[in-house]
Amino acid sequence: MNAAGFTFDFRPGRIAVGAGCVDQLGTELERQDIDSAMLVSGRTVGTTPAVVDPIREGLGHRLVAEFPETTPAKTLGTALAGLERARTEGVDAVVAVGGGSTLDTAKVLAALSSHGDSAAAVARDAVETGDLPVATDGDPLSIVAVPTTLAGADLSDLAGVTLSLDRDADLDSERADDGPPSGGVRDPRLMPDALFYDADLYRTTPQSVLASSAMNGFDKGLEMLYSPLSTPITDGTAARGLRLLRSGLGAISEDPMDADRLSDALAGIVAVQYGLAGAEGYRASIVHAFGHGFSHGYDVHQGTIHGIVAPHVLRYVFSEVDGRRDLIAEALGLDVAGRPADVVAEAIVDAVAAVRDELGLPGRLRDVEGVAQGDFPEIADAIHADDLLAVAPDGVDPSVAEIAAILERAW
């Protein structure tokens, strides 16, 4: 460890992992003095009895409203509509059930709630200015998260949002320059006060969704290790999480999924994101910047893009810097003791590609519907402008041309 030491400030809510754990929801809300809650979900999740019925039972009389209207577009308008419903019912908390879009929408809803009667005006201002603050003189609604995917963005106090008041904004047909702009909000008070990772609910998620989200979550563990903001604490959680994920992710392709392996996958996804969104900064990095480059105009999960580009991005990183390759190799269980640095790097690249292949994800950008080589200059510009590129490993600073070359190699 560097003699300068380190700081680590990360304050997640209570975490419950295990089959049937959502039956503790009511008890947890009682412990937190929360009397009433609104269930927030997407339209599919919110109408799937195998998902929502156990949650309804767990919440009991504290469940007073449901808002099954989130979408992948996660617009400001959707969050504002959810807040209006929450106010009508007088709820104390939102229970977000589903994937990253739903969790982000719930956080934006909570951020708006901190502004009281000014929420609609704040939303309109955010569309104009790109700035969505949390009020300093108001408290956001409490958030409880019940993830059903493995993207690993749950233990976080930040959220992305599409800055449009149109709830039905369609981003898939738009390019980044033409569609509504993206924004974000971050505040320690948006960290979920409790999180429930229920294996029974994950069994209801389509295999393709689990697979793509798992690649996204897996890459968070990799990037925590070479982040310039890494600490011995995050090294420990990320490395252990990667081992658990390598043990457990194979369960996703099984029917039925093996209980022990699924348990490993859930424990792993919690571990790899523990400390990801610390007060010191966000510890995801260049691979996620590449994923964000496809976030507008492409109907594709971020994890699918990760699976394709991560091996190529890692090979580039290792060509520029050490990238803590020995630590990453150890975390992945690779026997590379005494091997040359370039051999270690290639073993890591191969291991990450093997995870992708085990998940059944595509290996080339040309195999993703809607992606064209002619889009690469625009995508490369978006990646180069992404905030997460600023927290790439020390010494890694790709030009737009180098980013475009990586995309070409992934084609």
Predicted region positions:
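N-terminal small/polar loop signature for handling phosphorylated ligands or for N-terminal nucleophile
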Residues: 50-125, 129-135, 251-262
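A glycine/threonine-rich phosphate-anchoring loop and its flanking beta-alpha core
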Residues: 5, 114, 118-231, 324-331
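Active-site segments that bind and position negatively charged phosphate/pyrophosphate groups
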Residues: 227-343
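C-terminal charged capping/lid subdomain of soluble metabolic enzymes
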Residues: 335-411
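ATP/NTP phosphate-donor binding region
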Residues: 1-93, 366
